[in-house]
């Protein structure tokens, strides 16, 4: 049914009216806000409800901060219509800030009435807005109505003062800045509502330091600081300090406290000052030929900030340094200009250099002084100091050209020289030229003239030629002192000749049949002008080769080769290859090409299966022959004779045990048999005593060894088998002599000879077990000292005794109890040194050796009794030491008599002595009848002779039993026998032992002819005969030792000179070895020793071949004659 427009308007009005009625009288939760002005009367109900997004919300409630609002409670109330309509018990509840959220305790509400009360003073700066939610709940806590929101706004009051964000503000501005230039901005904040005037801040400058004039002003609203003028000068004031304050509102002065802050403004430096040089001109001095030396320093002052670019000076050369001799830089610490010589100057070329510099700053000048600055050069004069110069090359590199086509006749020609000149005179210097680098030895340089010649034809293709040049270096060494050197370089440019033809790089190739092309490459060792590009052509030999293969593409040094028909097999393709000059090799270049089937990703299949290796006929035949030889070896062993002695030399088992392996360079082999020589406990058991025949060696085991000792001054160095030993010698420089000794050394045996306390180890297989010399010396010294201490407890039996009628008592104990002389050392081990030594002796002699001969061989050391001094607390003794040893192949003349001796003060000295000349502060008495027993030790020695040798030479040959006569005489002159050279000295005791083989009678001792008849002389003589076990003749005439040989007389003498002998007496050296411990306490010299003319046997061509020693001790009491 259609309606008219009037009807539609009436219906719309009716709907609106119904809605208003529902709003006013329908069910719902209502909020009443009480107006503070109406004292508890609520606001009109409909003016505080606003429709928004289909929900009813209340308008905010405004409460002022800082006031007591408790008198205005309740400030709001919520109510539900269901309480009246249905009579339901309703409970009201609020949540939100101030109640259930911090800050707590601001609001409280009544659960029954829904009234909201305020309990605290509000602070907008703490909580500017409160949002509360109200609920209407039934008894079960369920919402009866939709929750209602309540907004409470806190109104601001001006209760806060402005506060600066910093206590100190820092800013900066360049000096000479224009007026009204912004310097910085300061900031202060106010906690009041920024949308009100309560938060407005006003700024003001309170004071300025320094306060000479106001340089800055402050915008009171924005806090910006500006300059007042352009007169800021850092050199005057480098910084300013401002005190500023901030106030509320427009800056009215009130009673409220005012916040202040400090502002520090630093004035930045600009380059508004020109650097000033200290002096107007400078002078310096440098030595020629020096480099990197400081010439001078130029000091500059600048008023700008120290250390900045505006202060640092910048130096530039205006003139005079076109040669680049000098360099100038700035010292950043002192702002000085350092002028340095960086290139050598020559006094002969320039004696003075004039320079000029300009000084600026590192930073550009400020615009305020650009018009004032004018560059002014600073003159500098540098004088060159002349020095004595060395040598130099005019050019350190000299170049020559040489062709590899030159002939050999041109090698002797000079290609140039490399002359060195004296830098002072400019003339050629006197130097020596030496090559230091000539890798392939191409050139020779004359050491005097520096002339350069080629010694080899240059080869361009040599691996030492780089880029067509060969380099050598020459050093010139000056002849003056100190020597100076200079190095020059010789560069030889080699001219290439087309003497090499292009050849194939790889003449044997294998390609797969599916490859369309074959790359063929050639090379030529000549230079670029005589090598590539190459020309390739295929030679049609055999005919048809050129049609089968063709060249499809050619590069400079290679071509691509293509086969007309794909066919497997091997082909030889001859090429004619020529270089850029048309030169080719006379022989054809043949490419051996194999076309084969290839696996995918692999090589030729045929090549992979051709690796089979099998045994050929020759290998099989060799294996069969080897088996036959193995079968033949047992048959050959049956033919060999077992157990038969070999003819000729007897094999020596275990040669490493007996013979020294001279072909080994290492240490001697380990000794496996410890010699019994070191087993004895006493001092005498560690050495073999002996003179000429002191070393008892087995027949056939002698090996001659020569040793020479040189005695000069007061030391003696002896070389024995390449080893030097030092011995003390009391000879003066005038009495220096050479004593040559020849000893006997057993091969591969260590024979230790104890000679006057010194120990010698002869090289041999037993050298590894030799005891240390220092250990032996210390051991025997302590041993002798212990026996010396024991002597005080025993009565002396074997020395000159001191009686009551003599002047002084003995200061030293007697050595009468010399039990250690008879030690456990037994030399019988030398009789049989074992089967190995016997076999070696048989090999060397070529005959059998019988060891059944019973030979007595003993040796006990002979010790000399020490005599106490007559007075004083020291024991004086003058000793002359010499030694004579003998070799089987070397003869030396006997030592000459000594005419002068010298004594020196030593302590605990161990010497080797042969002749002993002693001076003792004690009266010596002549001995009694020789028949009576006395303190006498007689050494009886027998010798057998061998081949003829010169006099004073003894050969220690194989031992033969024989008879000897030993004669011992003792002469003791009385105290009246005074010699003119020894008028102030004491007595002399002369002892002589004469040892003779059969056939020689000792001659009488001719000493009495030199003594005056009026003096008393006591002579004691004793003869003993030593004979082998077979017996000897009762007479002294015994048969000769060896047929056809001559007899040998060996005389051993011990002489003790004193003042009673005449100066004409000569004492020869005695050949003996004695162990003594000598202590000297005074230094003096005596005259020539007396010559007693004791006759020695001088029969030539005699040799001692066997020695036997027996030591017998006799006791004799000696008396004094008045």
UniProtKB/Swiss-Prot annotation:
It is found in: Cell membrane; Cell junction, Desmosome; Cytoplasm. Pfam families: Cadherin. It is a single-pass type I membrane protein. Residues 913-932, 1089-1122 are annotated as: Disordered. The modification Phosphothreonine is found at residue 808. GO terms for cellular component: apical plasma membrane; cell surface; cytoplasm; desmosome; intercalated disc; intracellular membrane-bounded organelle; lateral plasma membrane. Residues 1-28 form the signal peptide. Keywords: Calcium, Cell adhesion, Cell junction, Cell membrane, Cleavage on pair of basic residues, Cytoplasm, Glycoprotein, Lipoprotein, Membrane, Metal-binding, Palmitate, Phosphoprotein, Repeat, Signal, Transmembrane, Transmembrane helix. Residues 640-1122 are cytoplasmic. Induction: Induced by ischemic injury or kidney disease in kidney tubular epithelial cells. Its main location: membrane. Interacts with PKP2. Interacts with CTNNB1; the interaction promotes localization of CTNNB1 at cell junctions thus reducing its nuclear localization and subsequent transcription of CTNNB1/TCF-target genes. This is Desmoglein-2. The lineage of its organism: Eukaryota, Metazoa, Chordata, Craniata, Vertebrata.
